[in-house]
Amino acid sequence: MFCVQCEQTIRTPAGNGCSYAQGMCGKTAETSDLQDLLIAALQGLSAWAVKAREYGIINHDVDNFAPRAFFSTLTNVNFDSPRIVGYARDAIAMREALKAQCLSVDANAHCDNPMADLQLVSDDLGELQRQAAEFTPNKDKAAIGENILGLRLLCLYGLKGAAAYMEHAHVLGQYDNDIYAQYHKIMAWLGTWPADMNALLECAMEIGQMNFKVMSILDAGETTKYGHPTPTQVNVKATEGKCILISGHDLKDLYNLLEQTEGTGVNVYTHGEMLPAHGYPELRKFKHLVGNYGSGWQNQQVEFARFPGPIVMTSNCIIDPTVGSYDDRIWTRSIVGWPGVSHLEGDDFGPVIAQAQQMAGFPYSEIPHLITVGFGRQTLLGAADTLIDLVSREKLRHIFLVGGCDGARGERNYFTDFVTSVPDDCLILTLACGKYRFNKLEFGDIEGLPRLVDAGQCNDAYSAIILAVTLAEKLGCGVNDLPLSLVLSWFEQKAIVILLTLLSLGVKNIVTGPTAPGFFTPDLLAILNEKFGLRSVTTVEEDMKQLLSA
């Protein structure tokens, strides 16, 4: 086992990465190794997808499957080894079908990619795990060095984050053949184990640029189906009655669940990254969407254990449900998996609803505590002139975008301390689950404009980017000249690709934390600092002073 893709990876003087029987996320060595094997199979599939396009062959089933299966290897998504192997078998079967199509057009068609002819050696998981050793990401570290390995992983993990957003967009009926072509090209190239530093840096920027397009179509999918988010108050306390909790990012799953629970007497609560759903008109119209429950994903083993109803996980993040003994009432959807828990294959939430009706639910309603969400792209753009006016009248000094992932590391208290130290004449824009560190606190307003503005899920970084570009255009300056600072917390691969997106768009002087990715060497950090001004958090006092004076 070797896995260094998330922020909580093991870090030692001898090197970084989880390499024992179990990773810090709870992923076993078996599952981790089989995910490496799956990635190799997907690289072979992408290699033939690239070749097929040379013959004018575009298979939408392949384009849909490939990023979805890749998404299953993202942190805290799928811990179920047999399902990972199933994805690998499907990838190989699709690859062979594509290969046959190419050969039907050109009898001499061939693919030079080293993953293009990969076959699984056995049905036995142990044998497959041994085969997977051929594809462990650091197998040639001694030959290529830590810097090249780190750049490879930056590209692989960044592309994995983009693949997750591609799947979210596809679920909503949004896809772009050019994006799929670019995805396959990059995935296939990574399967050649590239070792050119400049080429890898260029690839990382290409992934970032591609992901900007992915976030654009995902935004279009969400707003077309569910309307543009508008500021909405959400209760974060319990309401009497039977209940279901839904977590993850998939708004379509939430919509289907709301439709199927309407009139049943079962209330629905959002959790984690599903919180922004309350801002969408077509979702909040359901009166039994009563509130948001819990805090950051890392607290779920305590909070889920206390929730008096079933729980549905639609995407990341799931962690071991046996710890809180709620594994008999947690349900996984789509690419999510945990051994031994119930998995919903389709869109029918009937079994979940039936379980909710058999459970007690909340015995009484708590005193409401309301927070505000729903500052989507249209709302943000509508406020652009107000922001400019406040800046011109010196009522608004600075905007801080403080967002990203949450996690268990104690150093993440930095982000709470940072936002509570932001001066009263500054605005805080936030997104993703890192906001749970401070989104229940009171920040007041600046002439009626809330000082804490929740822009949505991690992918809604797109809205923040569009706002920044709009402000820069209106002020006749560059984005980096705005009174705007980005302070980002990261945990997994979606955060990595959003960082690449920002860097590829030329955004500079981003501050990140709580620690640097484990695959970043000192040399790579120095390169990113020199090219982009990217740096790690220090102390709240020093960072605040530096950012306000920039």
Swiss-Prot record:
Modification Cysteine persulfide, positions: 405
Predominant cellular place of this UniProt entry's protein: cytoplasm
Origin superkingdom: Bacteria
UniProt subcellular location: Cytoplasm
UniProt-recorded Gene Ontology molecular function terms: 2 iron, 2 sulfur cluster binding; hydroxylamine reductase activity; metal ion binding; peroxidase activity
InterPro entries from the UniProt entry: HCP/CODH, Hydroxylam_reduct, Prismane-like_a/b-sand, Prismane-like_sf, Prismane_a-bundle
Positions with a binding annotation for hybrid [4Fe-2O-2S] cluster: 249, 273, 317, 405, 433, 458, 492, 494
Cofactor note: Binds 1 [2Fe-2S] cluster.
EC annotation from Swiss-Prot or TrEMBL: 1.7.99.1
GO cellular component, one term: cytoplasm
Gene Ontology BP annotations: response to hydrogen peroxide
Swiss-Prot/TrEMBL keywords: 2Fe-2S, Cytoplasm, Iron, Iron-sulfur, Metal-binding, Oxidoreductase
Cofactor dependence: [2Fe-2S] cluster; hybrid [4Fe-2O-2S] cluster
Residues the entry annotates as binding [2Fe-2S] cluster: 3, 6, 18, 25
Record-linked CDD domains: HCP (cd01914)
Catalytic activity reported: A + NH4(+) + H2O = hydroxylamine + AH2 + H(+)
Classification via NCBIfam families: hybrid_clust, PRK05290.1
Stored PANTHER family: HYDROXYLAMINE REDUCTASE (PTHR30109:SF0)
Family, per entry: Belongs to the HCP family.
Function statement: Catalyzes the reduction of hydroxylamine to form NH(3) and H(2)O.
Name of this chain's protein: Hydroxylamine reductase
Species of the source: Salmonella typhi
Lineage per the UniProt record: Bacteria, Pseudomonadati, Pseudomonadota, Gammaproteobacteria, Enterobacterales
